Swiss-Prot record:
L-serine binds at T231, S232, E233, E285, S385. Catalyzes the attachment of serine to tRNA(Ser). Is also able to aminoacylate tRNA(Sec) with serine, to form the misacylated tRNA L-seryl-tRNA(Sec), which will be further converted into selenocysteinyl-tRNA(Sec). Belongs to the class-II aminoacyl-tRNA synthetase family. Type-1 seryl-tRNA synthetase subfamily. PROSITE patterns: AA_TRNA_LIGASE_II (PS50862). It is found in: Cytoplasm. This is Serine--tRNA ligase.
Amino acid sequence: MHDIRAIRENPAAFDAALALRNLPPVSPEILSLDADRRSRIAAAEAAQAEQNKASKEAGAAKGRGDEAEFQRLRALVTAKKDETARLQAEATALDAKLRELLLAVPNLPLDGVPPGKDEDDNVEIRRWGEPRAFDFAPREHFEIEGVRPGMDFETAAKLSGSRFVVLKGGVARVHRALAQFMLDLHTEEHGLAETWAPVLVLSEMMEGTGQLPKFGEDSYQTREGWWLIPTSEVTLTNTVNGDLVDHASLPRRMVAHSQCFRSEAGSAGRDTSGMLRQHQFEKVEMVSITDAESGVEEHARMTRCAEAVLERLGLPYRTIVLCGGDMGFGARITHDLEVWLPGQGKYREISSVSYCGDFQARRMNARYRPAGGGKPEFVHTLNGSGLAVGRTLIAVLENGQQADGSVKLPEVLHPYLGGRTRLGADGVLA
């Protein structure tokens, strides 16, 4: 959410930043509501003061036996009391309307975010690794002979419908190994604190990180009102919801491996084959809670943590910075990591690493005490995939596939597979 004071002070700059997202100006509507709300508050305070004055004068009139004046003042007290209540109710309604409007406005891009409308305008900033030269036509993951026995879409469709998968045997073991490897790397080498949290959360938590109220259709809600998390960003970031933390406790760097659930609204017809786009999937998510000065540096650090996973696995990738028109709702700047998928012959997103500034913190009312004292300030938040486990599995299978239908597995996974190094053409680890 945005700071209304900053919008009052420089509405032109606010609208100019939104223009980088290709959005029309909204400051006139915001400031009009704000002015109406403030005028009601001022009028309510004036009416309350008149009520207090009349009440005091009524007491004096009663004391000197002036019954007529007492009755007049008592009626005035009642009228001002009713007026105060009416104005306060109007101010409360306007405040709710203003908050609703502010909650629907996305975060402002950082200076330097490239302008653009969509993914075609994103800017590559680096790449790592050379795509492998195959001496045969590489297949997509679900076409590889050794993968087919362990990737069962037919049974999944019987159980749950489209965009689900049942993993079996060696493929399931590799999937599990990837998640364990990612957690070990992030906790033991990158210094992130492993966290396990619920996958069902309250609406306030989804609002805190920006999924609600605008993007409710993208997630699943239970009859009881809980939401299934679309990412552990929701739970990890909201661990400081409503808190006032000490500066010395920052940065807080967390990582979680969880199930994630997305309705994929608006994705009809996209990636319908294979397990690239699923309603239920696993992800290792990184979140940092930091102060106002460290956010940009922390963003670079988190990006490197995600890149390290791909490098250890030997997977070619490129890092891009998203243009204003392609950034997510809560981000000020986003780095996407795209891994090379030889079966598709192109790079596909496998991680998004975003710096959100104090945007989420204002929604959560999450603050910290500055080390030198002074007024509490809002924390700054960051989140990033480290990585999406299913998509990493796809990349490992496609990049490691062999002409005979087997898959050569990355060396860093061997200890997690009991020393096994390959997925055979029969789907058995060997």
